[in-house]
Amino acid sequence: MTFSPRRAIVTASDSGIGRATALALADAGMDVGVTWHSDEEGANGTAEEVRRRGRKAIVAQFDATDLESVPGVIRHLAEELGGLDVFVNNAGGGTGGPFLDMDIDGWRSVVGLNLDGAFVGMHTAATLMADSGEEGRIIAVTSVHGSQPRVGSAAYVASKHGLEGLVKTMAQELGAKGITVNSVAPGEIATPINDMDAEDAENTHRPGIPIPRPGKPEEIADVVAFLASPASSYVTGATWVVDGGMLQMGPQAGSHLESDAWRSAG
């Protein structure tokens, strides 16, 4: 039987990558559960755009750090949608600050958001998919820092490394149930979290990236939409890097730095 996804949940879809992903999945014919943490107006705007595409949208507040509430929100959205075929774990953020300045509370705050919340969310989604007996797609939005470090972001980097490992282990265990699990690892993307709007991508020059600009949210969303589609049926446990070639510049870029400014968290 060909996988025909009709119902998706995208966490943190009030703006940026999450919003673009919700719209891309709606364009692919899916009804979408839209979630927000602090920007209800943004989530309602995303939902309205989904509806303009002729698809159903359900909006719910979602706090990935409130681990007891996470399963209930996902189950509620799935029930309202009539089931769950695609789950996109997009909620995340934070840096944690320089390593020597961190305390355990700061560490737990970032790891709790990016890894604990992701585990509970994806576990809930996978359980719903497995119990339905139907195929499913789980996609985690990670980061290029899931494989490479970043000064001033020890907790963030550790949490994203952990999330990449979780994705790969889930892929091993869930494949026989018809559930694929993949990650999409963005580089610098023109989103509000980076103090940019999508239109800033074309007007911002990044000489250290082979494609010398930030990415657009839609360029991440298009890859997520592929992984959520029937066309990705034999793809699982993979990390899809969408970074304009940033990760290819390691030694060459490092050898051309002309100051020690990179050593500061700023």
List each model region and its residues.
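Active-site helix of classical SDR
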Residues: 122, 159, 167
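Residue(s) in the substrate-gating loop at a strand-loop-helix junction
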Residues: 143
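Short, small/polar-rich loop/turn modules that mediate ligand/substrate recognition or access, typified
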Residues: 83, 88, 175, 180, ...
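Conserved glycine-rich cofactor-binding loop
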Residues: 14-16
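Alpha-helical segment proximal to the catalytic Tyr-Lys
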Residues: 127, 172-173, 233
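C-terminal helical subdomain
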Residues: 176, 183, 191, 203-235, ...
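Substrate-binding pocket helix/loop in short-chain dehydrogenase/reductase
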Residues: 98-99, 106-111, 205
